[in-house]
Design a protein with these regions (language model features):
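Alpha-helical transmembrane segments and their helix-start/interface "positive-inside/aromatic belt" motifs
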Residues: 1-15, 81-94, 213-218
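Hydrophobic, membrane-facing alpha-helical anchors
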Residues: 6-11, 85, 114-122, 166-174, ...
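Alpha-helical transmembrane segments
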Residues: 6-22, 92-100, 161-167
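Alpha-helical transmembrane segments of multi-pass membrane proteins
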Residues: 12-35, 101-109
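Membrane-interface segments at the starts/ends of alpha-helical transmembrane spans
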Residues: 37-55, 187, 191
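Juxtamembrane helix-loop-helix connectors linking adjacent transmembrane helices
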Residues: 39-43, 47, 70-135, 147, ...
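Central hydrophobic cores of alpha-helical transmembrane segments in multi-pass inner-membrane proteins
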Residues: 60-73
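Transmembrane helix-loop-helix hairpins at the membrane interface
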Residues: 125-232
Length: 232
């Protein structure tokens, strides 16, 4: 138990430091689009909202990391996986990442790219870290946390992967709607939802079979498209 708590604390601390610049920037970018908000008069409200968002993200990461470290290997999963296997599977990681990037581009990016561009940071340093940060957050929460939790509760790996994928896909749609993207229920929303589901189910299955390190590596490769789309 001490090892689980120690690993969870270290991971949460690292993600806390990693989260600050990105959450601060994206929260600022979101509020900047809200015409009802005045930074000159409501700075205190802005900071309170940012701290609440940071606290929520850290709570999710800490809970999911605890679940993952405590239950992953206990349930017979690969945990973080074999790092040597990851090194030996670079071609597969690249291939899977490219396929996921294409699926995501066709189902989401192609339709929403212009709306997402306003949220891209102007700092190249921040931009370079986006694929890693997004991948870490998604894999820790959706795979390490939710898949492990549901597998422990329902005793069925396949159901755990599907439920985790469904919940995370719906959560992402809710975030898009919150920031003004996909405000209405239409065919485009369904297309994005199905794309998110397919990708999440694949990554969930990869996590079960090969470990979190493998699903994380594939996710990072797929999310590199975010930088390419910014420049092109």
């Amino acid at each position: 138990m001490k090892k689980v708590l120690r690993n969870s604390f270290i991971l949460t601390l690292l993600m806390f430091l990693f989260s600050i610049p990105y959450l601060y920037y994206f929260y600022y970018a979101y509020l900047a689009r809200m015409t009802v908000f005045s930074f000159a008069t409501e700075t205190e409200v802005y900071m309170i909202g940012f701290l609440e968002l940071l606290g929520l993200v850290l709570l999710m990461i800490s809970v999911c990391s605890l679940i993952g470290f405590a239950g992953s290997e206990k349930l017979g999963f690969k945990g973080w996986g074999d790092w040597q296997l990851i090194k030996d599977s670079l071609q597969k990681i690249l291939l899977f990442g490219i396929i996921i990037a294409l699926v995501t581009y066709i189902s989401k990016d192609f339709h929403l790219l212009n709306q997402f561009r306003s949220y891209y940071p102007s700092s190249v340093i921040l931009l370079l870290g986006i694929p890693l940060y997004i991948s870490l957050f998604k894999e820790l929460c959706a795979r390490f946390g939710l898949v492990t939790l549901f597998a422990g509760v329902f005793k069925t790996k396949q159901l755990a992967v599907i439920l985790a994928a469904l919940i995370f896909a719906i959560a992402q749609i809710a975030v898009y709607q919150l920031i003004g993207v996909l405000p209405q229920f239409n065919w485009l929303l369904l297309t994005v939802l199905m794309g998110e589901l397919v990708v999440s189910i694949f990554l969930g299955d990869l996590y079960l079979k090969k470990g979190l390190g493998m699903s994380l590596a594939v996710s990072v490769v797929a999310n590199l498209r975010l930088m390419l789309l910014f420049f092109f």
